[in-house]
Swiss-Prot record:
Function: Necessary for efficient RNA polymerase transcription elongation past template-encoded arresting sites. The arresting sites in DNA have the property of trapping a certain fraction of elongating RNA polymerases that pass through, resulting in locked ternary complexes. Cleavage of the nascent transcript by cleavage factors such as GreA or GreB allows the resumption of elongation from the new 3'terminus. GreA releases sequences of 2 to 3 nucleotides.
One Pfam family in the UniProt entry: GreA_GreB
Record keywords: DNA-binding, Transcription, Transcription regulation
Stated name of the protein: Transcription elongation factor GreA
HAMAP family the UniProt entry points to: GreA_GreB
Annotated family: Belongs to the GreA/GreB family.
Any one GO biological process: DNA-templated transcription elongation
Keyword Transcription regulation among record annotations: yes
Amino acid sequence: MAQEKVFPMTETGKKKLEEELEYLKTVKRKEVVERIKVARSFGDLSENSEYDSAKEEQAFVEGRITTLDNMIRNAKIIEDDGANSDIVSLGKTVTFTELPDGEEESYTIVGSAEADPFEGKISNDSPIAKSLLGKQVGDEVTVQTPGGEMLVKIVKIS
């Protein structure tokens, strides 16, 4: 039997996924079933766009429930025990400057399940995180990005 994928995440990230799962199971699922019921009442299902739309949404919701359930079941909680606080690792926030112009950026490195670049949380599978993991303050690192290579210097890890 194949081993299931492990999803590294913070305790906060796991709680957010659990909340989303609960919402989908208790609220959204019922809303979609009601939409299907209403659409069925319109008659002929062969040309019923409301019915098709509701069925598509139901498939999406059920798929998301399955995905979230799997992620939560296979979550590996990242604990910040304070050890190696000078090394970039999962759960750490790393601040670096882009060389040579010195533009500063900060990201928290998290598991893919809770990545949200708009909130400054990047996946440990991202090119930037892969380049930074295991490095220390003062290290200069070449990062591969979709836009090409960039050289950065790590200035802070917290």
